[in-house]
Regions:
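General structural signal for secondary-structure boundaries
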Residues: 38, 65, 108-110
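Short edge beta-strands and adjacent turn/loop segments
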Residues: 3, 39-64
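Short, non-transmembrane amphipathic alpha-helical segments
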Residues: 22-37, 69-97
């Protein structure tokens, strides 16, 4: 049997606070990111954020088709999207509260449907 000490309990509570705070920032960021993408004619189909206990965050952006993804890669839209996301995270205070350790991945829903039978959880696991 394991005994959880008060020190361990305190660490767990602090970690939970960080996780909730990190999610609060990300919930503010996502609509802004979507708005930016619409305004710049590079519509994001789906976005997933995977926070890592205040240490970093993975942001996975999906476009609808492989064709869109390839066009955006070739036309520098992917780099502009990364820059816009970082600007949004800075504007809302995320970077100041946590840090700028953000890992990006880009894919298409078409690929998720084809390779993962539409299961985004399996797709995200492959990153």
């Amino acid at each position: 049997m394991y005994i959880i000490t008060q020190e361990m309990e305190n660490e767990i509570q602090e970690m939970d606070k960080k996780n909730f705070k990190q999610w609060d920032y990300l919930k503010k960021a996502i609509p802004r990111i979507i708005h930016w993408s619409k305004k710049n004619n590079c519509r994001i189909y789906r976005i997933h954020c995977i926070p890592h206990s205040g240490i970093s965050v993975d942001i996975c952006i999906f476009y609808k088709t492989d064709k869109e993804l390839n066009i955006y890669k070739e036309s520098n839209i992917i780099d502009l999207t990364k820059e816009a996301v970082m600007n949004i995270l800075t504007e809302i205070g995320y970077v100041e509260e946590f840090n700028d350790k953000v890992r990006f991945s880009f894919d298409s829903d078409e690929n998720v449907q084809r390779k993962y039978l539409g299961n985004y959880g399996l797709r995200l696991h492959d990153d």
